[in-house]
C-alpha cells in the first residue's frame, strides 16, 4: 500500500494509522522533560520481604536519546509550556500554583455506537511538571471523552493536585501525596509481619 499525502498529514497530528499507548507517550514526554534521555519504563524499585529484607533492586535502564538538536528540544519545551499558559489547556490549569507543561489532544473516532449515535472523540492530555525542574510525567486518555482540554486536561489537573498537595489554588504543606511533592528516592521502612495467632484449643 502506498502512503498518500493525506496519510502523512494524519501522521503528523497523531491520527490515521498512528497507534500509541498512554504509557509510551508518557515515556516520550519524560524524555522531553529530562533533556532527551529515553528510560525503560519500570513499575517497581525493589522486591522487599515482610521482614524488611531487600530481595532485589531494579536499576533504571537507559535506552537511548532523542535524536534532535538541543535547540529543537528547547523550542518544544517552550511550546508545551505555552499550551498551558495561553493555549488550549489554559482553562484547565487556570490559577494552578505549579508550572505545568503539556499538550491537549482530540482524536477523531470513526464509527457509531450501538444506539446509532456517532462516536465521540478520544480525549488526550500529555504533560510533565514542574516545568523548570520536572519530577513527574502524567498522561491521560479517555475513550469518547470529547476534547482533550475539557476532559483529560481536567483529570490530569486533579492528579497534579494530589501529587503537589494543591487545594484552592495553593500548595498546602503536608497535603502532597509524597513529602514536598517529590517522589521518594529511598525504599520505605517495612515493619516485620505480625505473626498469626494460634487457634485456641
Go through the PLM ranges and name each one:
Residues 1-64, 71, 77-170, 201:
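Active-site beta-strand/loop architecture of penicillin-binding DD-peptidases
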Residues 165-192:
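Intrinsically disordered, low-complexity mixed-charge segments
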Residues 191-201:
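Long, low-complexity, intrinsically disordered segments
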Amino acid at each position: 500500500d502506498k502512503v498518500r499525502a493525506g496519510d502523512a498529514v494524519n501522521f503528523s497530528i497523531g491520527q490515521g494509522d498512528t497507534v500509541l499507548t498512554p504509557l509510551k507517550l508518557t515515556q516520550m514526554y519524560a524524555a522531553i522533560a529530562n533533556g532527551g534521555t529515553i528510560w525503560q519504563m519500570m513499575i517497581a524499585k525493589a522486591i522487599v520481604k515482610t521482614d524488611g529484607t531487600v530481595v532485589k533492586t531494579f536499576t533504571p535502564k537507559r535506552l537511548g536519546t532523542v535524536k534532535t538538536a538541543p535547540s529543537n528540544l528547547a523550542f518544544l519545551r517552550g511550546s508545551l509550556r505555552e499550551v498551558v499558559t495561553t493555549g488550549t489547556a489554559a482553562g484547565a490549569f487556570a490559577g494552578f500554583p505549579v508550572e505545568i507543561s503539556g499538550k491537549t489532544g482530540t482524536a477523531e473516532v470513526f464509527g457509531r455506537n450501538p444506539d446509532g449515535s456517532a462516536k465521540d472523540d478520544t480525549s488526550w492530555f500529555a504533560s510533565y511538571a514542574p516545568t523548570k525542574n520536572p519530577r513527574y510525567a502524567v498522561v491521560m486518555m479517555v475513550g469518547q471523552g470529547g476534547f482533550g482540554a475539557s476532559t483529560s486536561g481536567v483529570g490530569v489537573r486533579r492528579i497534579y493536585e494530589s501529587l503537589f498537595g494543591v487545594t484552592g489554588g495553593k500548595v498546602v504543606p503536608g497535603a502532597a501525596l509524597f513529602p514536598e511533592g517529590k517522589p521518594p528516592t529511598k525504599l520505605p521502612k517495612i515493619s516485620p509481619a505480625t505473626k498469626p495467632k494460634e487457634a485456641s484449643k
